Amino acid sequence: MRNYDLSPLLRQWIGFDKLASSMQGSQEPIDFPPYNIEKKDDNHYRITLALAGFRQSDLDIEVEGPRLTVKGSPAPSEKAVEYLHQGLVFKPFTLSFTLAEHLHVSDAHFENGLLHIDLVRDVPEALQPQRIAIGGGRPALNQQSAEDAS
């Protein structure tokens, strides 16, 4: 089994570095369903899963703490089908993602066989970087304390 180090690629992603390490440690590669993780900007992400043949009622999305879990269970076919070639996969799956702090699901929709899960990072204002203005007309602290002493 090949072991790829994805950490340089995932450093800029919010919360997905744990996913890469858990994928690297597992014995079975995650090959179903195929998915993309898109970064729209520093605070907006989208996970897209390709789920051809699934219906919206076959899918379940849960968030428990920092873990986002997507489950799919296709309804069993009522007809017995004899396949000459079967390239489409209709099997149950569970796919989990570890979300970073302050990252939450803002929307999920299923369209044309694609499940889109939108994520938003809402950092509280107290934790956001703050700009400090550099004053030009105020006296320095040493001068001010010398004036106060006299």
From Swiss-Prot:
Protein name: Small heat shock protein IbpB
SUBUNIT field: Homodimer. Forms homomultimers of about 100-150 subunits at optimal growth temperatures. Conformation changes to oligomers at high temperatures or high ionic concentrations. The decrease in size of the multimers is accompanied by an increase in chaperone activity.
Family statement: Belongs to the small heat shock protein (HSP20) family.
InterPro entries: A-crystallin/Hsp20_dom, ACD_IbpA/B, HSP20-like_chaperone, HSP20_IbpB
Entries under PROSITE patterns matching the protein: SHSP
Alphabetical UniProt keywords: Chaperone, Cytoplasm, Stress response
Function: Associates with aggregated proteins, together with IbpA, to stabilize and protect them from irreversible denaturation and extensive proteolysis during heat shock and oxidative stress. Aggregated proteins bound to the IbpAB complex are more efficiently refolded and reactivated by the ATP-dependent chaperone systems ClpB and DnaK/DnaJ/GrpE. Its activity is ATP-independent.
Keyword Ribonucleoprotein part of the UniProt annotation: no
Origin species: Pectobacterium atrosepticum (strain SCRI 1043 / ATCC BAA-672) (Erwinia carotovora subsp. atroseptica)
One GO biological process term: protein stabilization
Domain sHSP: 26-137
GO cellular component assignments: cytoplasm
Domain comment (free text): The N- and C-terminal flexible termini are involved in oligomerization and in the binding of non-native substrate proteins, and are essential for chaperone activity.
Keyword Chaperone belongs to the record: yes
Localization per Swiss-Prot or TrEMBL: Cytoplasm
NCBIfam families noted in UniProt: PRK11597.1 (NF008618)
Domain of life where this protein originates: Bacteria
